[in-house]
């Protein structure tokens, strides 16, 4: 993915995520944070031969790697997984 690719809005969610802010980062990556600014993690849209799905992931401590929480068919589910 080109790092200069324009960020895209997260596909329409079933309900507005109460108490969360979803910020487009680049291309198909969004940061999910609480309204106080604490970053919960990221949602990334991944497309393969089965179609698009949404991967929830968290940054591990100060490391530069992510812990994948799960992959979901709907963006709402990927965002919800980061709440817990």
What are these language model-derived features?
Residues 22-24, 50, 54, 76:
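Generic preference for hydrophobic/aromatic residues in regular secondary structure cores
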Residues 25, 46-49, 82:
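Compositionally biased, intrinsically disordered low-complexity segments
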Residues 19-20, 36, 57, 76:
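Low-complexity, intrinsically disordered short peptide segments enriched in small/polar/basic residues
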Residues 40-65:
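Short aromatic-glycine-(Arg/Gly/Cys) micro-motifs in beta-strand/loop hairpins
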Residues 29, 43, 71-74:
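A generic structural signal for ordered secondary structure
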Residues 4, 11-12, 52, 74-77:
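Generic signature of intrinsically disordered, low-complexity, basic-rich segments
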Residues 1-35, 64-68:
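Negatively charged, low-complexity tracts enriched in Asp/Glu with abundant Ser/Thr
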Residues 61-84:
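A short, charged, amphipathic alpha-helix used as a generic interaction element across diverse proteins
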């Amino acid at each position: 993915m080109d790092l200069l690719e324009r960020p895209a809005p997260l596909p329409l969610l079933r309900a507005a995520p109460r108490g969360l802010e979803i910020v487009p980062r680049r291309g198909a990556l969004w940061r999910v944070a609480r309204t106080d600014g604490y970053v919960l993690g990221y949602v990334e849209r991944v497309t393969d031969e089965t179609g698009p799905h949404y991967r929830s992931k968290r940054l591990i401590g100060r490391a530069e790697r992510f812990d994948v929480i799960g992959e979901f068919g709907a963006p709402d589910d990927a965002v919800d997984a980061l709440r817990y």
